[in-house]
Amino acid sequence: MRTLVVLLIGAVLLCSANAFLDELLAESVNDMTDKRACFDKYKSNICGGVISPAHCVRRSGRMAKFAKENCAHFCGFC
């Protein structure tokens, strides 16, 4: 009887540990995708050339909107 109780407790603990590991792995995958999301599409020719840091802090305007959407790394939004 004791052996059965010990085995059941061990099975429950093992299942909870596996669920915890699955949650950790899911969180690490989410973190990795967030890091990849921030990049400059036009780094070599527009961000830093045509777009200036002043465009990053403006509230409105075509250039400000473009800078916030496409030059996130240049503007320091990452």
Swiss-Prot record:
From its record, what is one biological process in GO terms?
neuropeptide signaling pathway
Among its keywords, does the record have Phosphoprotein? Answer: no
Query: Which residues are part of the propeptide segment?
Result: 20-36
Q: Which UniProt keywords apply?
A: Cleavage on pair of basic residues, Disulfide bond, Neuropeptide, Signal
Task: Give start and end of each ShKT domain.
Answer: 38-78
Cysteine pairs bridged by disulfides in the record: C38-C78, C47-C71, C56-C75
Tissues in which the protein is found = Expressed in ganglion neurons residing in the mesoglea (observed in both planulae and primary polyps). Not expressed in nematocytes.
Show which residues constitute the signal peptide. 1-19
Q: What does this protein do?
A: Probable neuropeptide.
Name of the protein in its database record: Protein Class8-like
What organism, scientifically named, is this protein from?
Nematostella vectensis (Starlet sea anemone)
